[in-house]
């Protein structure tokens, strides 16, 4: 029987980007994004959610989000910049998560909407219980809030035994909106 590693998936939508006259992949962070990313890095550290591994889109705004968030972690986990994250669908991201070695306790995935939001909803809405909660512990209200807005620099925290399982122990325990 496989050991339960208490794995946690952190889905981090990149911080607010600017819209200069450059290709979409090359868009930098806006001032608000530059300010929000370090706050989110510190929040992860303070919440005890320092990742053991990071998967990050190759888009500049995602790389910049990691660059500004990482110092707040007070750790330097290995990071992989993966071009497959940019433009991916939720199912593509799920496949990338499945490639991560089982020994990784906490995985941080920095990417883009709609895929980040769609993956969070997919995992958080795993089969509902009689109590009206998904197996992930997310209520219909939690899911509705996430559907209505998964803002830039927001993080969904999904905790479970082995990434990604069809049923989760709990989720959206750390739904964190971007820094004010």
Task: Describe each region flagged by the PLM.
Residues 17-19, 117, 165-166, 180:
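Short, acidic Gly/Pro/Ser/Thr-rich loop/turn segments
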Residues 9, 106-108, 155:
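Residue-level preference for the first positions of well-ordered beta-strands
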Residues 104-124:
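A glycine-rich beta-strand to alpha-helix segment
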Residues 1-2, 71, 99, 147-148, ...:
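Short secondary-structure boundary/capping segments
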Residues 124-170, 176-179:
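Domain-level recognition of soluble alpha/beta enzyme cores
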Residues 98-109, 166-175:
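A polyampholytic, Gly/Pro-enriched intrinsically disordered region
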